[in-house]
Regions:
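Bacterial N-terminal signal peptides
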Residues: 16-25
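Short, surface-exposed loop and linker segments with low hydrophobicity and enrichment for Pro/Ser/Thr
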Residues: 14-17, 361-362
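Sequence signature of WD/YWTD-type beta-propeller architectures
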Residues: 29-384
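N-terminal secretory signal peptides that target proteins for export/translocation
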Residues: 1-12
């Protein structure tokens, strides 16, 4: 609210008003940050279901679309590409995307780019009608597209990998690894592999089960949280060579609640050991770690890895965004208690809530999906 006396022609009245406002906090002046929220660098005014930055800063995103058939109301997301110069191209018209004779709906859950920035892996959550009674079956599938919208057919076959979640390319831009459900629903996963030119093949880590797995940037290896199939033993942090069966156990975890994330340099890893505490660990010296009490949420690393940007809610749920400074990692002796810090949370974007967010690869921009209509907005990355 702007003070009614702020524009008075009497200087003494303006000064008195200013002093009174400071004392009682009754009036405020719009801040630069508020103006910035009204003027994003980019506004994609659509119902966004997922998005991801390409290595060069382009954005692939999916848009919620419904259409009717004679028997069913179906959902088939469109997929679009936002070019750096401002141009937008539709890569996939969802209504025209079909497989087999059974009706199905899908939403895009996530995207992953190839290292060369030319191919896109779209993880689809599908619901298929499997009989005349209307019984349905849910599954994960991965669709392969190039950045021109052409479907990429594996070994001249289909462009869809069935039963494939959290897919990613290896550094050769040819091999793909993904997760298949080993214990439903999404409790444990096995690793499956395919190549664009030859098709699927047995993973070197066949028979092992994982709670989570992420590739290391620029390497043919991954960090995984392994759990035995019976789920009776502890979770173990492993480094896997994805081209062989070689592996290195990094640590036995006190707990695992999700959120596995590898830092941009590939030198650190972070994850929640329970619903409150985040553990950050050095991958070169796994006994060097830190614990922070920040509450369960979704986070991304700052470019310099000195802090994280945390959305204080679960994935696909709305929450506010806060910066969390990371403490130095220190050596911890096995069997000794690990100290837990309680860092301050620095709110950004006026504490508004967002459904999804991502930091651009160059660390300059922040993309957010707003709560409600779910438009995609891009701002300069707020520092504080």
């Amino acid at each position: 609210m702007t003070c009614p006396c702020a524009h008075s022609r009497f200087r003494w009245l303006r000064q008195f008003c200013s002093m009174l406002c400071v004392l009682v906090g009754c009036c405020s002046v719009p801040t630069r940050g508020a103006q910035d929220l009204d003027k994003p660098l980019l506004n994609i005014d659509e119902d966004i279901t997922a998005f991801a930055y390409a290595p060069d800063g382009r954005i692939v995103y999916s848009v919620h679309r419904n259409f009717k058939t004679k028997l069913y109301d179906l959902e088939h997301d469109d997929i679009w590409l936002q070019e750096a110069g401002g141009k937008r191209r539709r890569l996939l018209e969802g209504q025209k995307f079909n497989r087999g004779n059974l009706p199905f709906s899908y939403i895009v859950n996530s995207f992953r780019w190839s290292p060369n920035g030319r191919m896109i892996l779209a993880e689809l959550l599908t619901t298929t009608v499997i009989d005349d009674s209307g019984k349905t079956q849910d599954s994960f599938q991965t669709l392969l597209l190039d950045d021109g919208g052409k479907e990429i057919r594996i070994a001249k076959g289909d462009s869809v990998i069935p039963d494939a979640a959290d897919p990613f390319f290896l550094s050769d831009n040819l091999s793909i690894n993904c997760l298949a459900e080993a214990v439903k629903p999404r409790m444990l996963f096995s690793l499956k592999a395919t190549r664009l030119n030859t098709g699927s093949f047995q993973s070197p880590h066949e028979g092992r089960t994982f709670r989570d797995l992420l590739p290391l940037p620029g390497a043919n290896s991954a960090i995984a949280v392994e759990q035995d199939h019976s789920q009776t033993g502890p979770s173990r942090l492993q480094r896997l060579d994805l081209l062989s069966d070689e592996h290195q156990e990094l640590a036995t975890l006190d707990g695992y609640e999700g959120g596995l994330s590898v830092s941009p340099s590939g030198k650190k890893v972070a994850y929640f050991i329970d619903k409150e505490i985040l553990e950050v660990r050095d991958l070169a010296s796994p006994d060097h770690l830190a614990r922070l009490r920040i509450g369960l949420g979704v986070f991304h690393w700052s470019p310099d890895e000195s802090r994280i940007l945390l959305k204080r809610s679960l994935e696909k749920k709305s929450g506010d965004l806060v910066w969390i400074d990371l403490p130095p990692l220190s050596a911890v002796t096995l069997g000794h208690a690990v100290p837990v810090s309680q860092p301050s949370a620095i709110s950004i974007l006026h504490g508004l809530t967002f459904r999804d967010f991502a930091i651009s690869p160059d660390g300059r921009f922040l993309a957010v999906v707003i709560t409600g209509k779910r438009s995609l907005l891009v701002f300069p990355l707020p520092q504080r």
